[in-house]
Design a protein with these regions (language model features):
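Active-site beta-loop-alpha junctions of metal-dependent nucleic acid enzymes
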Residues: 155-158
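Intrinsically disordered, low-complexity regions enriched in acidic/Ser/Thr/Pro/Gln residues
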Residues: 1-140, 145, 151-152
Length: 158
């Protein structure tokens, strides 16, 4: 059987129409990625999202799947400025000042976790379709407190 290749493409993320980041991603869950990025940048903590859409207008809209806007009706605060595109690193790279990032972080409550449940999590990861066909992706998984997977997303491994 021929080898399968994974795709990676750039995606621009806009908040209320203003460009806030350009990142590389495996296409598929673009709206979730855009909203998640805004949440981790600290601009959606207390702000409702009115809509998420591709930015294409008119007859060319079908081809504008690399540009997503998160609309809050102008209620979101201005994101921390970045010096260039968002990288696939830790997320700090490209920010103008670390202090700007820390200003928007909220403390997390302590959440003790059963070590035995943690040990079982690796065995509960199923459904890596892209990895099965390409062997070239990694996954991120969110688990509930009992160790059951809630959501799994795959992306190109570096």
């Amino acid at each position: 059987a021929p080898d399968e290749l994974i795709v990676e493409e750039p995606m621009s993320i806009r908040l209320d129409g203003e460009l806030i980041a350009t990142t590389m991603r495996t296409p598929g869950d673009d709206f979730v990625l855009a909203v998640g990025f805004c949440v981790t940048e600290g601009v959606l903590h207390d702000v409702p999202v009115r809509s998420v859409r591709y930015c294409g207008q008119g007859p060319a809209a079908e081809s504008e799947f690399n540009d997503v806007t998160v609309d809050t009706g102008g209620l979101a605060p201005t994101p921390t400025p970045r010096l260039g595109p968002a990288s696939s690193s830790c997320g700090v790279c490209g920010t103008v000042a670390i202090g700007d990032l820390l200003e928007r972080l909220r403390p997390l409550e302590a959440a003790p976790f059963d070590v035995e449940v943690l040990a079982l999590m690796a065995d509960r990861i199923d459904g890596q379709a892209l990895f099965t066909t390409t062997g070239a992706v990694h996954a991120a998984v969110a688990f509930d407190r009992t160790g059951e997977p809630l959501v799994l997303r795959e992306d190109i491994g570096r």
